[in-house]
Swiss-Prot record:
One of its GO terms (cellular component) is cytoplasm. This is DNA polymerase III subunit alpha. Gene3D superfamilies: 1.10.150.870, Bacterial DNA polymerase III alpha subunit, thumb domain (1.10.10.1600), Metal-dependent hydrolases (3.20.20.140), Nucleic acid-binding proteins (2.40.50.140). Its EC number is 2.7.7.7. PANTHER family: DNA POLYMERASE III SUBUNIT ALPHA. It is found in: Cytoplasm. DNA polymerase III contains a core (composed of alpha, epsilon and theta chains) that associates with a tau subunit. This core dimerizes to form the PolIII' complex. PolIII' associates with the gamma complex (composed of gamma, delta, delta', psi and chi chains) and with the beta chain to form the complete DNA polymerase III complex. One of its GO terms (biological process) is DNA replication. The lineage of its organism: Bacteria, Bacillati, Bacillota, Bacilli, Lactobacillales. DNA polymerase III is a complex, multichain enzyme responsible for most of the replicative synthesis in bacteria. This DNA polymerase also exhibits 3' to 5' exonuclease activity. The alpha chain is the DNA polymerase. NCBIfam families: polc, PRK07279.1. GO terms for molecular function: 3'-5' exonuclease activity; DNA-directed DNA polymerase activity; nucleic acid binding. The gene is dnaE. The keyword NADP does not apply. InterPro entries: DNA_pol3_alpha_NTPase_dom, DNA_pol3_alpha_thumb_dom, DNA_pol3_finger, DnaE2/DnaE/PolC, DNAPol_HHH, NA-bd_OB-fold, NA-bd_OB_tRNA, PHP_dom.
Length: 1036
């Protein structure tokens, strides 16, 4: 029977449409028993192909296509692994090819267990190679020209499932080669997956011996994977078990903890670790963290369930004492659930490459590698790549891809988005392009590198998996799942920028304050830091900077570190429903139900609420006598909602509880509660470790805010300036002679850096810093290199006021810039004594200057216009930070944004405003009645007094606005003869409600009155209405 050997898969990136799952399905439909893959140079899909075939009852045949230079001729070879030995040889051959090291001598040394096929298209009778081979023939091969001494074998290339796919493959070739469709060669036909029986009949008729050769070749092919664990030996000269014991004992003694219950807990953990064969693993992790600390890097407090291990704490792998904080080792590792321990190594993100080099040098480049991932055609990428080849312009592509949401597939966005569907159906070529995009969506586009994963092995990695060359170290061709399935150790090196922040803050405190802070020794009950959490002042704090977490902190107001840990766990779906119960029970406003005295100590710290997975395990241990290992199995069954396992466990739980004298009814009720909570209970060890890291960051924010904001703005984002301004920092005005490159904070002043100026070349910024001081605008321009004498580079410097020291009128410099550039380039060198003749012009207003600064660097650098208004204001107002719920207040603000909606009941318009008072933001609601009055006066960017009632919603204060008044000095002045027409004037003014104050001056008795209850919207219509009753109107 025919066997399909030469199948290119999607792992021959953009040269095939054969994905493995559909390949298995179609092969069975077409009557195949044996199928193969033969990707060019790589084995990316080999493991999943072999396993997938075995699962689907198909015989896998693994092949590899390579081209090799021999005797000045490129020879195309198809290599077939005939057995497990041949499979291992292919791993090595592919690795050599993907590393640029494959040559004929190497190939010949690795041909044991491999059959070689040379396709007839690449064969000639002059070809002489130092090994035996088959000639691969397809339906179109002229058999009369074949070498009668060589064995023939059927070989048909497959790249797609059906002829209809040819157009899609043509598109992929165009994308791959970055060509238009017209420039891309057409795809060869007859490369579809054909019916097995038809091909068998064809070869039986035309070349029966070739078919027999094929049957003989594949008849005994079978591959076996070695899945045994292959941990590297940490030290071949010493027992890992003994070394781990020595190190952990020394670690506890150094911490002053060589006493009970630490000694017995340590022995218990060491026995389990040794019995499970993981001694070397812990030593390797210890070694890696030791390397980081030797370099002075802050390695954090650990993460995940590993924080429950005393061995990890003794080795300084984690920074949390699991005995003191009641963390469970069995949540991390136990003999009743055999799995690799999973200790993720957190490290400062800026040093990750140094760790990779250390692993490579310490354990060997043949024993360690990074792990491959595959970037696929996402919906946006597929649309962009395909539609571009149909000649769709960029602006249309952008408009179309904007309609695709983060979680959308092309099918779902087409179904739910009317506008997207309308665009697709608007043109025939769009419909065609969309069909192609859907066909390639999800297919691999290129390789990438796993963000964290590293694989390590005791022996050479290519004995187990194929590799390819990389920058810092080799990269696996197998993905993380296939790597671990082959028994290899995968470790995650997670570059955590929060560790970088903490380390840089520690360094800056030492430099600026001469104070050495031991980060690991920071008191987790520090009152000032706890107060910061209680206020929800946690912007920039790991795990706590999103609005949901901030609002939760404001509600809970943590009074001790344990409650910060609880907040982490409550800030999750399901658990958050118990926040009110948690607070009321803590304050004694709600009864705490501890169910049974025997489990009361487990539930008391969380006021009777099961927040943590470990609590479920402890209850199973104490109440039903489960071992902690068995309790962890129960926890897993509950969290995964494994109904069959849970039913079995429930009966076991009830029986065990009854055996200990518990009431059956109580036991069943308790199990149901455990089952409910386990579905969303959080890993306490992980919550504790990450809350500790958050607390360390918050410690710097509480005690050294200038250092905190300096690091956050320079290593993370200048967006943190908003938070800094709310904390009473001020943006300082800088000059061309003083502006730093990065942001700098000194004495509560923020000096924005040149790096914030959008579009400013870094080299130009460095040039400015190196060349200063400058003596004038002319001096700066004269010395500026010609390549930077462009308005696109110079105008932002002028608009943010860097030349105000020389010429405060920014508009004047801008209007004269063309003339200045001519002067410095043409006249300045000829007439060095001459000076530039400036043309005067009116400067920008303070508001315009501030807006320009915001546009260019993201924040105003000069005095905020609102501050000037506040200083001159005669009206009483309340800062947003001092607002109190359920009170009436007036605020002086600037409107950031206006969102208008229609009510569901009446269909009337109302508005939601986002406003600020330079330090804090506030949400404001105008209901239909108020919005109808003031809508013509409201404008984004303008300044107003808002009067209204302060409400609390979702634990945030907001205002329901009743009155709006423009915060400007202009007033509407009316000059009238006397009081004769007061009633008429009052009636007219009342018909034009607005935000402008009105002042009436009576000429006859020299009396001036400022109206307190009437404000107007000044229009031409108002002036016309007043004309018969007033002598004059002035708006100023």
């Amino acid at each position: 029977m025919f066997a399909q050997l030469d199948t290119k898969t999607v792992y021959s990136f953009m040269d095939s449409l054969i994905d493995l799952n559909h390949y298995f399905e179609r092969a069975k439909q077409f009557g195949y028993h044996t199928i193969g893959i033969m990707d060019k140079d790589n084995l990316y899909g080999a493991y999943h192909f072999i396993k997938g075939c075995q699962k689907n009852g198909l015989q896998p045949v693994l092949g590899l296509e390579v081209e090799i230079l021999y005797q000045e001729r490129q020879v195309l070879l198809n290599l077939i692994a005939q057995n497990t030995q041949g499979y291992h040889q292919l791993l090595k051959i592919s690795t050599a090819k993907m590393s640029g090291k494959l040559h004929m001598d190497y190939l010949c040394q690795h041909l044991e267990g491999i059959a070689v096929i040379i396709p007839s298209k690449g064969w000639s009778d002059t070809l002489v190679v130092p090994f035996d081979y088959y000639i691969g023939v397809d339906q179109y091969t002229d058999l009369s020209h074949m070498d009668s001494k060589r064995q023939l074998i059927p070989l048909r290339t497959v790249r797609y499932f059906a002829q209809d796919d040819m157009e899609t493959l043509h598109m992929l070739h165009a994308i791959r080669d970055n060509l238009s469709l017209a420039e891309t060669p057409v795809v060869e036909s007859d490369q579809e997956l054909a019916d097995c029986q038809q091909l068998t009949t064809f070869y039986q008729t035309h070349c029966p011996q070739a078919l027999q050769n094929l049957e003989d070749l594949v008849s005994g092919i079978y591959y076996d994977f070695d899945t045994n664990l292959k941990l590297p030996h940490f030290n071949r000269d010493k027992s890992a078990k003994q070394e781990l014991q020595d190190l952990t004992e020394a670690g506890l003694k150094e911490k002053g903890l060589w006493k009970e219950p630490y000694q017995s807990r340590l022995l218990h953990e060491l026995v389990i670790i040794s019995d499970m064969g993981f001694d070397d693993y812990f030593l390797i992790v210890w070694d890696l963290l030791r390397f980081g600390r030797s370099k002075g890097y802050y390695m954090g407090m650990g993460r995940g369930s590993a924080a429950g291990s005393l061995v990890a704490y003794a080795l300084d792998i984690t920074g949390i004492d699991p005995v003191q904080h009641d963390l469970l080792f069995e949540r991390f590792l136990n003999k009743e659930r055999y799995s690799m321990p999973d200790i993720d190594i957190d490290l400062p993100d800026i040093y990750r490459s140094e760790f990779l080099r250390y692993v490579r040098n310490r354990y060997g480049s043949d024993h360690s590698a990074q792990i491959v991932t595959f970037s696929t055609f996402g919906p946006k990428q597929a649309i962009r790549d395909v539609f571009k080849r149909f000649g769709v312009p960029e602006y249309e592509l952008t408009n179309l891809t904007k309609k695709i949401g983060f979680k959308d597939s092309l099918a779902t966005v087409y179904e739910k988005s009317i506008s997207f569907r309308q665009v697709i159906n608007s043109r025939t070529e769009f419909q065609k392009a969309f069909a192609i995009a859907k066909r390639i969506e999800g297919n691999p586009r290129q390789t990438s590198i796993h963000a964290a994963g590293i694989v390590m092995s005791d022996d050479t990695l290519t004995n187990h998996i194929p590799l390819k060359s990389g920058d810092d170290m080799m990269i696996t061709q197998y993905d993380a799942h296939a790597v671990e399935a082959n028994g290899l150790l995968k470790m995650d090196f997670l570059g955590l920028r929060n560790l970088t922040f903490v380390q840089k803050m520690q360094e800056k405190v030492a430099k600026d304050y001469g104070c050495q802070i031991d980060i690991a020794a920071i008191d987790l009950e520090d009152p000032q830091t706890l107060a910061l959490f209680a206020k929800g002042d946690t912007k920039g704090i790991f795990q706590f900077e999103q609005n949901g977490a901030i609002n939760l902190l404001k509600r809970i107001k943590p009074q001790r570190f344990e409650e910060i840990v609880a907040t982490t766990s409550l800030n999750r779906p399901g658990a958050s429903d118990y926040t009110t119960n948690f607070i009321k029970r803590r304050e004694g406003q709600e009864k705490i139900d501890l169910i049974d005295p025997v489990i009361a100590p487990i539930l008391e710290p969380t006021y009777g609420i099961m927040l943590y997975q470990e609590q479920v395990m402890q209850i199973a241990q104490v109440y039903a006598g489960f071992t902690l290992g068995k309790a962890d199995l129960l926890r897993r069954a509950m969290s995964k909602k494994n109904l069959q396992e849970m039913q079995k466990m429930e009966e076991d739980f009830i029986a065990s509880a009854k055996h200990l004298g518990r009431a059956e009814e109580t036991a069943r009720g308790l199990f149901k509660r455990m089952e409910k909570f386990a579905g969303y209970g959080f890993n306490r060890s992980h919550a504790f470790a990450y809350s500790a890291l958050a607390f360390q960051l918050a410690y710097f924010k509480a005690h050294y805010p200038a250092v905190f904001y300096d690091i956050m703005m320079n290593y993370s984002s200048s967006d943190y300036i908003t938070d800094a301004l709310e904390s009473d920092f001020q943006v300082a005005q800088v000059t061309i002679n003083s502006i730093p490159y990065t942001d700098k904070i000194e004495a509560s002043k923020i000096y924005m850096g040149l790096k914030n100026i959008k579009g400013l070349p870094r080299d130009f910024a460095y040039w400015i810093i190196e060349q200063r001081p400058f003596n004038s605008v002319e001096d700066f321009l004269t010395r500026t290199p010609e390549k930077y004498q462009k308005k696109v580079f110079l105008e932002p410097l002028i608009k943010i006021g860097l030349f105000d020291y020389f010429e405060p009128n920014r508009k004047k410099i801008l209007d004269n810039l063309d003339g200045l550039l001519v002067f410095v380039n043409e006249l300045g060198s000829l007439f060095s004594d001459s000076s530039f003749s400036w043309v005067d012009t009116k400067d920008y207003s303070a508001t315009e200057k501030y807006s320009l600064e915001q546009e260019i660097v993201g924040v105003g650098m000069s005095k905020h216009p609102l501050i000037d208004i506040a200083e001159k204001s005669t009206q009483t107002f309340t800062p947003i930070s001092q607002l109190v719920k359920e009170s009436e207040a007036v605020v002086l603000i600037q409107i950031d944004s206006i969102r208008i909606i229609r009510t569901k009941t009446s269909g009337q318009q109302m508005a939601f405003l986002s406003v600020n008072d330079t330090k804090k933001k506030l949400d404001v609601t105008l209901f239909p009645q108020e919005y109808a009055i003031y809508k013509d006066q409201l404008k984004e960017g303008e300044f107003y007094y808002l009067k209204g009632r302060i409400k609390e919603r979702d634990h945030r204060l907001q205002m329901v606005c009743q009155q709006v008044q423009m915060a400007i000095s202009q007033k509407y002045w009316l000059l009238v003869e006397n009081h004769q027409f007061d009633s008429q004037i009052s009636e007219i003014l009342g018909a034009f409600p607005g935000t402008t104050p009105v002042v009436i001056h009576y000429q006859k008795n020299k009396e001036t009155i400022a109206l307190t209850k009437i404000q107007v919207h000044v229009t031409e219509n108002l002036k016309e209405k007043l004309r018969p009753f007033v002598l004059k109107t002035v708006f100023r």
